[in-house]
């Protein structure tokens, strides 16, 4: 139900922009619920929300996202083993991506996106994701750097990845943010100890990095950046 409400809240306009959702706003409450209900018990106190912004994606961005969905569905229809979710909607999921914020967005009422390449949040919203979006220390440690865009099922893990990215940048002023995204997961490959085994395997659209105790995919690498559509920016308190 929460996911359906999120889809209804995503607006499309002629240029990319963001609008702050103030405290008490019904849309903000839904985003807060999404962040809170996704937390694991061990993460219960690590994410404190300071600001929430709604992303207004361009028609072109949304069209690219839908075109990718159709490509995934078409590819799935040609497989001998059918995957119902892939055939239905491309296996769409709601995921979090942690990123650093190097500009004044959210400070003193600022709501404009910056043009700096050093600001991961604004760069992603303006230009979309890239495979380098997965290059945090976690993906490097497990050998998956450069495999795809790193996403998580919990806001707490995404916040940790934003922390890792900030440590890499060595910028004490960088703030942490979460991007709440719709993603087309498509056909998901099970986790691999050696990611080199994955190279050259056709027919998969994403790679599971970590699977939880109930077979839920806690960490997921999207192989194609077009598979992600950022919907909300959640700026976290330090």
What label would you give each PLM region?
Residues 72-78, 115-130, 156:
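Eukaryotic beta-rich interaction modules
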Residues 165-171:
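Short proline/glycine-enriched turn/loop segments at secondary-structure junctions
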Residues 1-114, 233-238:
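Intrinsically disordered, low-complexity terminal and linker regions
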Residues 107-111, 162-165, 192-196:
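Short coil/turn segments at secondary-structure boundaries
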């Amino acid at each position: 139900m929460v996911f359906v409400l999120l889809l209804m809240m995503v607006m499309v306009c002629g240029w990319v922009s963001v609008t702050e959702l103030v405290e008490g706003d019904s849309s903000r409450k839904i985003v807060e619920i999404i962040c809170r209900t996704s937390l694991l018990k061990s993460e219960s106190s690590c994410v404190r929300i300071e600001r929430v912004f709604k992303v207004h994606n361009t028609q072109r961005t949304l069209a690219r996202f839908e075109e990718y969905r159709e490509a995934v569905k078409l590819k799935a229809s040609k497989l001998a083993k059918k995957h119902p979710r892939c055939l239905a909607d491309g296996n769409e999921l709601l995921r979090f991506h942690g990123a650093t914020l190097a500009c004044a967005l959210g400070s003193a009422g600022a709501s404009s996106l910056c043009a700096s390449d050093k600001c991961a949040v604004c760069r992603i919203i303006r230009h979309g994701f890239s495979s380098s979006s997965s290059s945090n220390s976690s993906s490097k440690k497990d050998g998956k750097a450069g495999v795809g865009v790193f996403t998580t099922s919990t806001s707490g893990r995404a916040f940790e990845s934003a922390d890792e990215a900030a440590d890499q940048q060595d910028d004490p002023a960088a703030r942490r943010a979460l991007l709440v995204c719709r993603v087309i997961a498509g056909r998901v490959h099970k986790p691999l100890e050696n990611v080199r085994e994955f190279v050259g395997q056709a027919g998969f659209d994403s790679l599971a990095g970590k699977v939880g105790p109930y077979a839920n995919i806690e960490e997921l690498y999207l192989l194609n950046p077009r598979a992600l559509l950022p919907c909300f920016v959640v700026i976290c308190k330090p």
